[in-house]
Regions:
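A residue-level signal for beta-strand positions that form part of recognition/binding surfaces
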Residues: 120, 380, 397-401, 431, ...
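C-terminal segments
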Residues: 145, 479-480
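Structured loops at beta-to-helix junctions and adjacent beta-edge loops in soluble globular domains
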Residues: 126-128, 162-164, 373, 384-386, ...
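C-terminal beta-rich recognition modules with glycine/proline-rich loops and embedded aromatic residues
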Residues: 364-368, 395, 480
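Glycine-centered loop/turn motifs
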Residues: 377, 447, 470-472
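Non-catalytic terminal/interface segments that mediate subunit docking, oligomerization
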Residues: 377-424
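Cofactor-pocket helix-loop regions in the catalytic cores of large enzyme subunits
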Residues: 1-167, 171-174, 186-363, 402, ...
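Short, solvent-exposed secondary-structure boundary/capping segments
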Residues: 467-479
Length: 480
């Protein structure tokens, strides 16, 4: 477990982890804080923030050069570019990683031995890995580690991203990425045009922009209008001051949401949407399980499900979107996304969801991927060196490292949970956790309101002293 306080972020996954632990599974947690997951662990690596990549590279060094614990058969038969990886790891000893990570070399060695020994080892990670300067490289290094030990393509192995919401996987499957169409077909590919033009007609084939590029475009004026649906970037995106400047610089802003969020307050037009209890459709979760959801309550007067709003907007713009139901839309998805082709609403209801790929009506679904081969044929080892600048250096003006994360009673920006009195009662305001030694040095006391200032901005929060984090670090939940 790396980069995830699963007890607060994914409580159902945490329940499975605790059950596996009771059955004898070994648990390793990499987290700067001593969270409930860390307390449960056989090994807790209280890493120095920002240094996940150095740790993963050191683990592979131990497995490869000291323990000879790599899966040579898997490497030879299923992967490529292994020699480049091997050369890049030669100097990544535990002694090299120790001053970077703050970990003892023997703890790194013990972790490497336990993971490689298996016989089945699985890695779960979340935003503590991805939302860092080295996030992409660390994900690549984790994929290297999995392939190095052959821990993929069979039950109880693999590399599992714990998604931030219940349909992140489904959104990506349906093309909510800048470079792909539904089914992960490149937008500018011949296959993409062949597959989708027959349903949609001609369409633009250039790749879209990444979220950071969109925000930059709003500020520099190259993007003049935006349509934001189910998103609250005024609270969820980094550097709120720059986000607000970009949104205010637009000529026209549409926001489609279920509540009046800080982002919606800046909109020229608000399209009131229905909540998840008021619509039908599917969610696809982190294990690629497509699950049917049913309408529990009718939408409130003046609101509509997202799919209906989108159809109405398309038709108003002169397009054609004459769908009558989510079922009809799903049937179109089945035509153009082969991994969904064997599913229908009846099967999803009867079988309590199916994991894609499910290419035919008689296919049982696929509980785990890459059993015989990878999508590209062979798995590609990549070189992921640790950069000189990790983006989190402290100095005299900013002597603390800020950690962010969730609490169990709030969900993302709190748009929904702050409207539940029972949930909001537990965490009604922002708080800052600080080690007692640091609080004493600054002559701060529990329950005082303090101003936390970074290079990007500041926030007022109520102080809590906590011994579950390291001196020199502070923790702030990102719901506020």
């Amino acid at each position: 477990m790396i980069g995830s306080n699963t007890s607060a972020q994914h409580p159902l996954a945490y329940a499975r982890i605790t059950a596996a632990k009771k059955r004898g599974a070994k648990l390793i947690t990499v987290d700067p804080r001593r969270t409930p997951v860390a307390t449960l662990s056989d090994i807790h690596l209280a890493i120095r923030p920002g240094n996940n990549l150095a740790l993963v590279n050191a683990l592979m060094h131990v497995i490869l050069f000291e323990e000879k614990g790599q899966d040579d058969a898997f490497i030879n038969e299923r992967t490529e570019h292994f020699d480049a990886l091997r050369a890049s790891l030669e100097g990544c000893t535990p002694e090299w990683a120790a001053p970077l990570t703050g970990l003892q070399p023997e703890a790194i060695r013990e972790t490497a031995r336990l993971y490689a020994k298996g016989p089945n080892s699985i890695i779960l990670y979340c935003m503590g890995v991805t939302q860092q300067v080295t996030g992409t490289r660390t994900c690549g290094a984790l994929a290297n580690l999995v392939m190095l030990c052959g821990m993929i393509g069979r039950p109880s192995t693999g590399l599992i991203p714990l998604r931030g919401q219940n349909n992140v996987q489904g959104s990506c499957d349906m093309g909510a990425l800048p470079e792909t169409l539904p089914g992960y077909v490149k937008a500018d590919s011949e296959l993409g045009h062949q597959r989708f033009a027959r349903l949609w007609g001609p369409f633009a084939d250039e790749q879209g922009k990444k979220l950071t590029e969109i925000m930059d475009g709003m500020r520099d004026g190259s993007i003049r209008a935006a349509y934001i649906m189910g998103e609250n970037p005024m609270q969820s995106d980094p550097d709120a001051a720059k986000v607000e400047a970009g949104l205010r610089n637009l000529d026209f802003l549409i926001v489609q949401d279920i509540f009046m969020t800080p982002t919606a307050r800046l909109a020229d037009v608000i399209l009131p949407a229905a909540s998840y209890l008021e619509k039908q459709g599917t969610f696809t979760n982190t294990e690629r399980r497509v699950q049917l959801i049913n309408e529990v309550l009718p939408p409130l007067p003046g609101t509509r499900p997202d799919w209906r709003i989108l159809c109405d907007v398309i038709n108003a713009l002169g397009g054609r979107a004459d769908y009558d139901s989510p079922r009809e839309i799903f049937n179109e998805i089945r035509q153009v996304v082969p991994s969904y082709a064997g599913m229908d609403y009846t099967r999803l209801a009867e079988e309590q969801g199916l994991c894609w790929p499910c290419p035919t009506p008689d296919h049982p679904g696929t509980p785990y991927l890459h059993a015989a081969s990878f999508t590209r044929g062979r798995g590609l080892f990549t070189v992921n060196d640790v950069p000189d600048d990790l983006g989190c250096a402290t100095d005299e003006t900013y002597p603390f490292t800020l950690l962010t994360g969730r609490v169990s009673h709030h969900y993302h920006t709190g748009t929904m949970t702050r409207r539940s009195w029972a949930l909001d009662r537990e965490y009604p305001e922002a708080f800052l956790d600080m080690h007692p030694d640091d609080a004493a040095a600054l002559r701060l006391k529990d329950n005082w309101k303090v101003r936390v200032t970074s290079r990007q901005g500041s926030i007022v929060a109520r102080l809590r002293t906590a011994t579950d984090l390291q001196p020199g670090t502070v923790f702030l939940p990102f719901h506020f």
